[in-house]
Design a protein with these regions (language model features):
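Active-site microenvironment of metallo-dependent hydrolases
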Residues: 1-139
Length: 139
């Protein structure tokens, strides 16, 4: 099913049920498990499935590829190490409520609209809020 060209492997409801289960890190799992360990996808095909395909399907014109004029969204990772870490419970919701989370493994940095927002240690505390709400897609 993952190899079906009509299947989108890059959608998640991470956060919708965060107290019960956690889909965060599904992209890292795709890169580590299905690309590196199982060889089901090439690295290029996985990058397309995670970024290019959703931008194409949803008509988001300036996303999904590294091209002049496109938003410079980038995940820098080590293909030999990339994975998601073990799931763990944290108590950082209102009232000290618990949720599940997972850490990135083998990720060196994240850039949103050309601005670095995370490094190998996690979110940068002084990073600008570089994201933008997309309100229009192509017709």
């Amino acid at each position: 099913m993952l190899k079906d060209p009509c299947a989108m492997v890059s959608l998640s409801d991470a956060g919708a049920h965060l107290t019960f289960f956690n889909d965060a890190g599904f992209g890292l799992h795709l890169l580590g498990h299905w690309v590196r360990e199982r060889g089901l996808f090439s690295l290029e095909e996985a990058a397309w499935r995670l970024a290019g395909q959703p931008a194409h399907v949803f008509g988001i014109r300036d996303r999904g590829a590294l091209k002049p004029g496109y938003a410079a969204d980038l995940l820098l990772f080590d293909p030999a190490r990339v994975a998601r870490g073990p799931k763990r419970r944290v108590h950082d919701l209102p009232g000290g409520a618990a949720r599940l989370t997972t850490d990135a493994v083998g990720v060196h940095g994240v850039w949103v609209n050309g601005r670095q927002v995370a490094d190998a240690n996690g979110l940068l505390p002084d990073a600008p809020r570089a994201g933008a709400l997309l309100t229009r897609f192509s017709d």
